[in-house]
Amino acid sequence: MNDIENYGNRYHVLQSFPMPQLASSREIRILLPASYYESDVSYPVLYMHDGQNLFDNSVSFGPHVWDIPEAVDAFFPNSQYDGVIIVGIDNASSHGKFSRMDEYSPWPRNTSFPLPGWDPDVDYSGGKGALYVDFIVNTLKNYIDSNFRTFPDRNNTAIAGSSMGAYISLFAAILRQDVFSKVGVFSPAL
């Protein structure tokens, strides 16, 4: 795996990016195509969840990262017309044990159904998924499209994730078919 520092001005981190829909903030991690600063072309955008797991082991909340920079560079050779802008949205795990579940769950948890191994006294309610999707569509996407050279149309906008990130990706793709034309659903928590 390459160190993320090797990607220089291609890798951007937006600290404490506001999430008004959820009265919160989050780090947003952006990887630009290798040719971004060598051309004036626009690029499609892929929004991904669990952003801290995409690029850099030092900030990952799990034991492994997706190695997105290596995968993207292998898939898109250094042609000025190839590439995609990857936007990683950090999850809410730093805001509480189950905050990630709250944001990635479109529907509230049925508290009368006990889940094995879960503490019923923990304030995990879920049901914030629609607000999270609204943040992506109406706040984050507007920022990305305004500050980077993107193709903002639905044919060039995708969303992807794994586990609960896959779950919310599928929900977003169904809910906002006017925005997302492609969805990556990896090992979904369905």
Regions found by a protein language model. Give the residues of each.
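Non-catalytic cap/lid and distal C-terminal segments of serine-dependent acyl enzymes
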Residues: 1-190
